[in-house]
Amino acid sequence: MPSPDKEMDKVLLIGLGGFLGAVCRFLICEHVDGQLGILSVNVLGSFMLGMIMYDAEYLSFIGPKGRLAFGTGFIGAFTTFSTFAVQSFSMAFLPALGNISANLFLTLTGVFFGRSFIKALSSREI
């Protein structure tokens, strides 16, 4: 069983990352309104998570603590599936369908390009 101190360190890393991620999302959404703001943070967050995913699998440049702080904390608070869902639910059918399609396609594309970007920088294969 992990010691309470080590668990608290993890909680603090996630909390610090989450604080920074939430502030960054707020700042972006203050300047990019509505669905485009949420789409922007979700796509950017997916791109960053794709980079972390590739790094964790092949490179280990970012250690476990960095992945907790940045992946779980920062990106977890930076992106927002719930706001995307509420926005989509409150729209008429066709605009909602477009919003859902754009979010799914672009966030998956973001993960792909994040992985590809780190792969190109590291010259390793996926």
UniProtKB/Swiss-Prot annotation:
Primary localization: membrane
Pfam families: CRCB
Activation and inhibition: Na(+) is not transported, but it plays an essential structural role and its presence is essential for fluoride channel function.
Residues bound to Na(+): G76, T79
GO molecular function per UniProt: fluoride channel activity; metal ion binding
Gene Ontology cellular component annotations, sorted alphabetically: plasma membrane
Keyword Lipid metabolism included in the entry's annotation: no
Transcription regulation among keywords: no
GO biological process: cellular detoxification of fluoride
Subcellular location: Cell membrane
Catalyzed reactions: fluoride(in) = fluoride(out)
HAMAP family: FluC
Protein role: Fluoride-specific ion channel. Important for reducing fluoride concentration in the cell, thus reducing its toxicity.
Sequence similarity: Belongs to the fluoride channel Fluc/FEX (TC 1.A.43) family.
Record protein name field: Fluoride-specific ion channel FluC 2
Species per Swiss-Prot/TrEMBL record: Methanosarcina mazei (strain ATCC BAA-159 / DSM 3647 / Goe1 / Go1 / JCM 11833 / OCM 88) (Methanosarcina frisia)
Gene: fluC2
